[in-house]
Regions:
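N-terminal Sec-pathway targeting helices
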Residues: 1-15, 19-20
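Short secondary-structure boundary micro-motifs
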Residues: 4, 49-51, 62-63, 157, ...
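N-terminal export/targeting and maturation segments
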Residues: 19-102
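Extracytoplasmic electrostatic interaction patches
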Residues: 91-206
Length: 206
């Protein structure tokens, strides 16, 4: 009888742990209105889109991000810096409301073409609870191709708690003779000073 009791207790502990995990990660049967597999208040880097899809082969760069957070706005921007001076700031697309609400969904983006160093357009879509905001942005012709020694990086951030107002880089480019490689400071105010030109596509949560 004691052995049976221990087995029952063990089963209860295992089931309880499994249910707590499912709840924490927003899996079924909990929180059907949230993005599955992502804890509350966090962002998930889903990296590049599935390259087995023939259509994705037409993209020079692409990515996907998942999120569950209380907030009012999800925005994707395109910025250009000359050293540490921002010379261009453009909104690509956004999804938002007048007050804080549950923001749960994904954003996908892509750069049509075959050369990530010669982009002409950015396409992005933000999905939230069945609604989608999508748009395209034509990149000005004088930004790329005029400076040598360019480098590029796709979604260099890690999964974790979302910090409101932080720039989560989707795609970044550095250009100039001073090109010293990429590190955690490359796409920061400190890193901008080391490059002749820096271009970033990023998402911000508010």
């Amino acid at each position: 009888m004691k052995k049976i009791g221990l087995i029952v207790v063990g089963i209860i502990v295992i089931l309880g742990g499994a249910l707590l995990y499912l709840n924490h990660m927003n899996y079924w049967p909990f929180h059907k209105d949230k993005e599955k597999g992502i804890p509350d208040g966090e962002i998930k880097n889903m990296n590049q889109l599935d390259r087995t899809d023939e259509l994705s082969l037409l993209l020079a760069a692409s990515g996907k991000v998942g999120y569950n957070v209380k907030g009012s706005n999800v925005s994707i921007y395109f910025d250009v810096y000359k050293r540490d001076k921002r010379v261009l700031h453009k909104l690509v697309t956004e999804f938002g409301s007048e007050k804080d609400t549950q923001l749960s969904g994904t954003l996908v983006w892509g750069i049509p073409g075959f050369d990530v160093f010669k982009p002409t357009e950015i396409r992005a879509a933000i999905s939230n609870d069945g609604a989608t905001s999508q748009d395209s942005f034509a990149i000005p012709k004088d930004i790329f191709g005029k400076i040598d020694n360019a480098g590029a990086q796709t979604q260099p951030f890690e999964d974790g708690k979302i910090k409101k107002g932080k720039k989560y880089i989707l795609q970044g480019w550095i250009m100039g003779k001073e090109n010293i490689g990429m590190n955690e400071d490359t796409f920061s105010e400190k890193g901008f000073k080391n490059q002749e030109q820096t271009v970033i596509l990023y998402v911000v949560f508010k």
